Amino acid sequence: MGKQATERRLADTEARAITKMIRTSPYKLNLVAESIRGKTAERALAELTFSKRRMADTVKKTLQSAIANAENNHQLDVDQLIVSEAYVGKAMVLKRWRARARGRVGKILKPFSNLTIVVRERGETA
């Protein structure tokens, strides 16, 4: 029903990396993604290296993949890259049950998330 979602086309100065099915809630993952948005790639990697959050390693791997894509696939200058977009999407939710007292059950939700990081080359501003 409705229109099929189309993926956004990247500009010549952009590169992207996507990680799917990350076993954490989108809220927790977005806290880490939010912290690197708009920063230089070098600064973002440094922040993720020393972050105490569990998802920082996953976000760091995705950012490194985006940087490698920019360098190898798009021939962009790594020193000029900034994190233009870092957004999180909701994936599936595993539903589990836990036996409780008097024959009842408690619902356990195990959410998964998708992460997309887009880096772009910083433009020269005069």
Curated annotation (Swiss-Prot):
It comes from the Bacteria. CDD domains: Ribosomal_L22. One of its GO terms (biological process) is translation. Keywords: Ribonucleoprotein, Ribosomal protein, RNA-binding, rRNA-binding. One of its GO terms (cellular component) is cytosolic large ribosomal subunit. SUPFAM superfamilies: Ribosomal protein L22. Pfam families: Ribosomal_L22 (PF00237). GO terms for molecular function: rRNA binding; structural constituent of ribosome. PROSITE patterns: RIBOSOMAL_L22. Disulfide bonds: none annotated. The keyword Ribonucleoprotein applies. The keyword Glycoprotein does not apply. Belongs to the universal ribosomal protein uL22 family. NCBIfam families: rplV_bact. This protein binds specifically to 23S rRNA; its binding is stimulated by other ribosomal proteins, e.g. L4, L17, and L20. It is important during the early stages of 50S assembly. It makes multiple contacts with different domains of the 23S rRNA in the assembled 50S subunit and ribosome. Part of the 50S ribosomal subunit. This is Large ribosomal subunit protein uL22. It comes from Rhodospirillum rubrum (strain ATCC 11170 / ATH 1.1.1 / DSM 467 / LMG 4362 / NCIMB 8255 / S1).
